[in-house]
Amino acid sequence: MKKKLLAALLATAMTVTMFAGCGTPGSKDSKKDDSSASSGKKRITYTLREDLPSMDPQNSNSISCATAEICTYAMLTRNVEGEIKPDAAESWDISDDGLTYTFHLRKDAKWSDGEPITAADFEYSWKRLVNPETASPYAFIGDCLKNGQAIEQGKMDVEELGVKAVDDTTLEVTLEHPTSYFLSLIGSSGQFAPLRQDIVEKYGTDFAATSEKNVYSGPFVMTSSEDNVWTFEKNDNYWDKDSINLDKCELNYVENTDTQLSMYEAGDLDYVQVPTAYVSDYKDKADVFANGNVDFCYINSKSDNPVLGNKNFRLALNYALNRNDYNKLANADTFTAFNGLVFPGLQAKGTTYGEAYDLNSYSYPLDGDQDKATEYLNAAMKELGIANASDITVEVVTTDADSSKRIVETLQEQWQNALGIKVKIRQVTYADIYGKVFPEHDYEIGYGGWGSDYDDPYSYLELFKSDSSYNYSQYENPEVDQLLIASQDEPDTDKRMDELNQAEQDILADGAFVPLQARNIYYMLDDDTTGINFYYCSLNIDWVYADVNAK
């Protein structure tokens, strides 16, 4: 059986469906007892990028959770190969001013226990999302709903949210402002999934903690969740079950990437991400797929370290960095050196964002600029009353993964050599960095990244909106805030895009963060598996409509 190598490369910014293609040397054993050949059942098995701590769509914030949730919940709409298709809602009407959406639910939409899916299930879920008592890490995604942000901030009662179940099959949604990507957003973000109030209240804080403490409305149901293996089986009550080819999918979390690759070679996985150390062995044989994840360093401008609150020092960090050399040293040139915030493959002005706007004309040079770095450093030291650069120490926090350590060690070397400052490294677990360190602002500089939740630059730019719950940098710029607010109400799509681009320019001019790279993520896929979709927004991978060819 041949292996198929798939790469998510920056150059392609579109949704692509995988089909059988080029192979790589060697063969992959097949040891699955319940494969389609032996049992008549169609099954795929693959690894997750990180642990799957919860299937509560409003208390999760990782791609792994989103990938699992979109398969187990029926959304109002569904993103299928880049197109918005009806799901639990069979149709919808949009008011002339773009503020009111009326969704008409299917009468045959059911939960896995046979109960009907109702408009009230969506109303309850969305109110739970923005309710401060829920403390959802993704509550901000409901800002587009009427009064959503005010409710999140405790300024209004949750009953004032712009969502109303008119009757069992009619849901009326009122937006805070026209949102061109709204149908895409609710079709790819698990936070907008329906929830059964009786089930949530029955299990309380244990809701969705295990497979049996939930009911499911989507194409699959979770049947077990033990020992870092999550099993999903086809939902016979799903309204579109005849379009679902797989009988079962197993998601595995294996921390060691070498072990993941060994499992794939042994035939225990159908799909695996290629460890960075092995990418050079495969990348010339790769197919091209898009991935919208960009990596950067957050700078906590309000940390206890005063140098990071200084604009000139932040600019010195950015100009001192040779991103091309960094990419070669840290990533073996397997990623793409990047000097912006917004993924250039997003749609803008009838083309892509990268084509519409010349990033290099307003950002830092990819090769760095030592003279400018020195100029900004000297200005910062003068303003801060620091005599010697060697008296400056900054700390970079990252996860305990080997690849992350290699990345920050490369940054450490470049910054120390170019600026003469001292750079310390602190490593914590993945769970801690996103669960405590970043949200609690317990860091100075932090290596992280972001992938767009929807096909719009706003998804990246809102990270630097002063009142965003994901403003880990504690960055504040009234002009940026005003541009982002204005963009939400701007009916002229081209003018709106210009406002968003100006916000990106202002953020870069402030040195608010340190852009590093766009991820080129490589995957290997069994040739007998087809129909998996890759996206540069939100999920990255969608296996709902996957199929397995007969062996």
Q: Model-flagged regions — what are they?
A:
Residues Y523-K551:
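Long beta-strand-rich cores associated with HINT superfamily self-processing modules
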Residues T47-D96, V215:
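N-terminal lobe/hinge region of extracytoplasmic solute-binding protein
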Residues E123, Y138-D198:
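Surface-exposed binding/hinge segments that line
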Residues T336-A380, A401-K405:
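Structural transition elements
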Residues T118-S125, D168-T174, G218-P219, L246-K248, ...:
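Alpha-helical secondary-structure segments
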Residues I63, L175-I244, K248, D258:
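Gly/Pro-rich hinge or "lid" segments in bacterial periplasmic/extracellular proteins
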Residues P365-L366, K422-I433, S459-D527, K551:
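Extracytoplasmic/peripheral linker and loop segments enriched in polar/acidic and small residues
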Residues T223-E233, E250-N305, N324, K328-L329:
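Extracellular/periplasmic solute-recognition and catalytic clefts
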